[in-house]
């Protein structure tokens, strides 16, 4: 990089500690999506809430309305941004595509392709704002492991609407028939009964 090709003009994003949160380092990424510009960063929100130690960071997104010539100074917020549109469940989604999770890890399937993997029984993933439209009673899930994955709506402690039974060391495509049609917009939880259950992909049909 030619040192004469640029000029330092100061910072544009405050440390989380300057925004009333715990202090932490940061790794940021700037992105433009549908005409709006954002900053992806991390905070210690989860560590604060769980009262733990060790730098337990979580990914966050905030608005950063920069232009080609100006970067206004902005800060991290606890609320973040609103969801830009509902998720379409009738398209296939990676198990790693989520809003948040607990007790989960990842297993690489191939270059750029990941599955989520439970670290313990009771692990879960949370997909926010899923629009089932006029409704479905069927899912197609690709998963492996020994145990079950439960589908729950709107509350991770809700009664399961569907149960995916697993007994395989390899990924299987499993059709799931639900006892009740799902309609409209819901938050979706996948709850894992035991360790080492992998969810690669899911889709409503």
Predicted regions span which residues?
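Carbohydrate-active catalytic/glycan-binding domains of CAZyme proteins
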Residues: 1-205
């Amino acid at each position: 990089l030619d040192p004469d090709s640029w000029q330092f003009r100061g910072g544009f994003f405050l440390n989380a500690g300057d925004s009333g949160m715990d202090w932490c380092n940061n790794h940021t990424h700037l992105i433009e999506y549908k005409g709006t510009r954002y900053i992806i960063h991390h905070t210690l929100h989860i560590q604060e809430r769980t009262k733990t130690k060790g730098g337990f960071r979580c990914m966050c997104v905030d608005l950063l309305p920069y232009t080609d010539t100006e970067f206004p100074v902005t800060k991290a917020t606890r609320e973040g941004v609103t969801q830009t549109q509902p998720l379409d469940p009738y398209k296939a989604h990676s198990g790693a595509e989520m809003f948040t999770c607990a007790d989960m890890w990842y297993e690489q399937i191939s270059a750029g392709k990941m599955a989520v993997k439970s670290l313990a029984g009771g692990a879960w993933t949370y997909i926010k704002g899923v629009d089932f439209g006029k409704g479905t009673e069927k899912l197609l899930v690709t998963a492996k492991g020994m145990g079950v994955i439960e589908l729950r709506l709107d509350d991770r402690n809700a009664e399961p609407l569907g149960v995916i039974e697993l007994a395989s060391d390899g990924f299987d495509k499993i059709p799931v028939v639900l006892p009740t049609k799902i309609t409209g917009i819901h938050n979706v939880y996948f709850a894992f009964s035991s360790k080492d259950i992998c969810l690669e992909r899911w889709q409503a049909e």
